[in-house]
Amino acid sequence: MVRNNEIGARPNKYWPVVAAVVAICLFGFLTVTNQKHATQSGDNIHKFANGGQYRDGSKSIKYNCNNPRAYNGSSSNITFSQLFLPVLLIGAALYAYLWFTRPDCSVTCRGDCCRSYGG
């Protein structure tokens, strides 16, 4: 009986961890970019969520009428594309790292690394 010294490649056990990290990062990214800040302005009858004005006889209310950021749904100046570009670059860097650190061969190795395989 011939003994086989070849060691098979280990299965990739990291894909659930990578999938969980990607899901958490996506959730965090969407949470940061989709913040809605409902303001509590006005009185007990009139509420203005994103600014506006009301005039009634002796009462006049103006809230954020001249603020251009009041109507875009976000209180920050960071846009979706400004947040998406770093996420895209980090994802590309991670993909490149995983691509260039993979083994050079797909055959089973004899106890040594595939990079030193002379096939």
Curated annotation (Swiss-Prot):
Presence of the UniProt keyword Transferase in the record: no
Residues on Lumenal side: 35-79
Family, as annotated: Belongs to the virgaviridae/benyvirus TGB2 movement protein family.
A GO cellular component annotation in the UniProt record: host cell endoplasmic reticulum membrane
Protein name as it appears in the record: Movement protein TGB2
Entry's localization field: Host cell junction, Host plasmodesma; Host endoplasmic reticulum membrane; Host cytoplasm, Host cytoskeleton; Host chloroplast envelope
Ranges per topology, Cytoplasmic: 1-13, 101-119
Transmembrane segments: 14-34, 80-100
Keywords: Host cell junction, Host cytoplasm, Host cytoskeleton, Host endoplasmic reticulum, Host membrane, Membrane, Transmembrane, Transmembrane helix, Transport, Viral movement protein
Bilayer topology annotation: Multi-pass membrane protein
Subunit structure: Interacts with movement protein TGB3. TGB1-TGB3-TGB2 complex formation is enhanced by ATP hydrolysis.
Pfam family name, one: Plant_vir_prot
Function as written in the Swiss-Prot or TrEMBL entry: Participates in the transport of viral genome to neighboring plant cells directly through plasmodesmata, without any budding. TGBp2 and TGBp3 are necessary for intracellular delivery of TGBp1-containing vRNPs to plasmodesmata. Can gate plasmodesmata and increase their size exclusion limit. To a lesser extent than TGB3, induces host actin cytoskeleton network thickening, which probably plays a major role in virus cell-to-cell movement. Binds ssRNA in a sequence non-specific manner.
Superkingdom of origin organism: Viruses
